[in-house]
Amino acid sequence: MDLGLAGRRALVTGAGKGIGRSTVLALKAAGAQVVAVSRTREDLDDLVRECPGVEPVCVDLADWEATEQALSNVGPADLLVNNAAVALLQPFLEVTKEACVTSFNVNLRAVIQVSQIVAKGMIARGVPGAIVNVSSQASQRALTNHTVYCSTKGALYMLTKMMALELGPHKIRVNAVNPTVVMTPMGRTNWSDPHKAKAMLDRIPLGKFAEVENVVDTILFLLSNRSGMTTGSTLPVDGGFLAT
C-alpha cells in the first residue's frame, strides 16, 4: 500500500534508538526526507552511516532554550513524530523532584514545544500536516512503580486531544499511539526475566509483546493521508491490553 509519504519532510524525536530510529528508517524507505533528533551524537552518527541523507540534530529536549535554538533552523516539516521519552521508575512514596522535573520536561513539555515549532511552520506555509505522539498503555492503566511515567503519559493523552482540537482548523491532524511493551533491544533486556514478563503477558489477550514494526507501521499510517479523517485519536498497539 502506497502511503503517499514520498517527498514529504518529517521530523522525528528520540530518533537514536528503538522506535524512533526504526521510524526514521521506515520514513526514508517510503521516500520521505527526515530530520532525526536525538540527544546522543553517537547514535545519530550511526544512524546517518546506516541511512545517508538523514538530517541529524543533536539536542537535549529537556532544555527549552537549546531546543528552541536547535530546531529554529531545521526548515519546514510536513510530519512530526514526538517519540522522545524517559521512563524513571519509582514507587509513589519514593518519587523524587528530579524524576518529576526530567519526566515532565521530556515526556510532555518537549512535546508541546516541538509541536508548536513545527505546527507554526505548517500554518505559516498554509499546508496541511500530521503529528503523531508516541504514548503508552501506561497513559490509561496504573502500573506499579510507574507513578511519574503513567502521569506524564496520561497528560499526553489529553494533550493529543487538545492539539487536535486547536490545530484541526489549520488542517493539521494529531493522533497518538499507545504501545504495550515493545521488543526493542532495551525492551528485550528489560523484560528478559520470564516471571516479570509473564505477569504482563497474562494481561494481554494476544499473549505477546509488540514488535517494533507493529508500532512503526501504525505511526506511518497515522502520518499518511490514508488516515485523513482521523484526528484526536489514540490507537492502541497493545494486543488487547486496554480491553481487559
UniProtKB/Swiss-Prot annotation:
This is L-xylulose reductase. It is found in: Membrane. The modification Omega-N-methylarginine is found at R21. GO terms for cellular component: cytoplasmic microtubule; membrane. It comes from Cavia porcellus (Guinea pig). Belongs to the short-chain dehydrogenases/reductases (SDR) family. NADP(+) binds at residues 11-39. GO terms for biological process: D-xylose metabolic process; glucose metabolic process; xylulose metabolic process. InterPro entries: L-xylulose/Carbonyl_redctase (IPR051737), NAD(P)-bd_dom_sf (IPR036291), Sc_DH/Rdtase_CS (IPR020904), SDR_fam (IPR002347).
